[in-house]
Regions:
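N-terminal helix-turn-helix DNA-binding module of bacterial transcription factors
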Residues: 1-53
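Short, solvent-exposed amphipathic alpha-helices that sit
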Residues: 74-89, 170-174, 199-217, 232, ...
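Short, well-structured alpha-helical segments in soluble
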Residues: 105-120, 232-246
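Hydrophobic alpha-helical segments within soluble ligand-binding/sensing domains
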Residues: 163-187, 233-234
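Single conserved hydrophobic/aromatic residue that forms the stacking wall/gate
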Residues: 251-259
Length: 259
């Protein structure tokens, strides 16, 4: 079985350079990186998983996850997935802590502070799109604590990755389905959305409304925001229907509220 040392010797570089290329971290000359990868493929190099486990076990990694509140069916399933993966990570001496908070920037900042005090090594968060949170994520990056945005993104910060959907496109797709249901007839629609603080909600609405504008027979007569609250959503939607009996269709941009 080929080793990193053998690859380094054949490429005429250090083992550290090979490690950076294999793990895609740090800056390596593109020609050198290509040469290393050609050697890797030629030798059919496979990482020593036993060695990785032993190395990881010395680190005692702690990961933190911040999700939106209890009782949200979508995030209940996300939590189940995290717990399932946590079992796989146990052999790497990695533990995962989950905090559930409301759609509130201050609560998210408090959860981050608690994680930092507990010595967390990395954080995944479903963030509000708030400059205060963006600045805190930048601070974490400078401290060597990487942050991944989960399900909804945040603008203008140093989060290292976003795991989620193209919400603008999903909104546009919903508009296309509305057009099919309207059957080219004059149609009045209402919009129910969650929170203006959550980027995936605002992106869905932007994609939806921009696409609807190209369908001249469809008019948006009202948009309501339920602050991600079931009871508020019920009351406001009921009021919407009373005030606008001409509505034919309602677009609910946050389907987790339907239970």
């Amino acid at each position: 079985m080929a080793t990193i040392k053998e690859i380094a010797d054949l490429a005429g570089v250090s083992r550290g350079t090979v490690d950076r290329v294999l793990n895609k971290r740090g800056s390596v000359n593109p020609q050198t990186a290509q040469k290393i990868m050609e050697i890797v493929h030629a030798l059919d190099y496979k990482p020593n998983r036993a060695g990785l486990v032993l190395a990881a076990q010395k680190k005692n990694l702690r990961l933190g996850v911040i999700l939106f509140g209890e009782g949200n069916p979508f995030f209940d399933e996300v939590t189940d997935g995290i717990r399932q993966k946590e079992e796989d990570l146990a052999c790497y001496n990695c533990t995962v802590q989950i905090k559930r908070v409301n759609v509130d920037t201050l609560e998210q900042l408090q959860a981050i502070d608690e994680f930092v005090k507990e010595g967390i090594n990395g954080i995944a968060i479903s963030p509000t799109n708030d400059p205060r949170l963006a600045r805190r994520i930048d601070e974490l990056f400078e401290q060597g604590i990487p942050v991944v945005a989960l399900n909804t993104d945040i603008k203008n910060c140093k989060r290292i990755a976003f795991v989620g959907s193209n919400y603008y496109q999903s909104g546009a797709t919903a508009a296309g389905l509305m057009r099919l249901m309207a059957k080219n007839e004059s149609t009045k629609i209402g919009i129910v959305t969650g929170s203006e603080e959550i980027l995936c909600h605002t992106e869905r609405i932007a994609g939806f409304t921009n696409a609807i504008q190209s369908y001249p027979n469809i008019d948006i007569v009202a948009t309501i925001t339920n602050d991600d609250d079931d009871f508020v959503s019920y009351d406001q939607t009921t009021q919407l229907l009373k005030e606008h009996p001409e509505l034919s269709l309602i677009h609910i941009s946050e389907p987790t509220r339907l239970r």
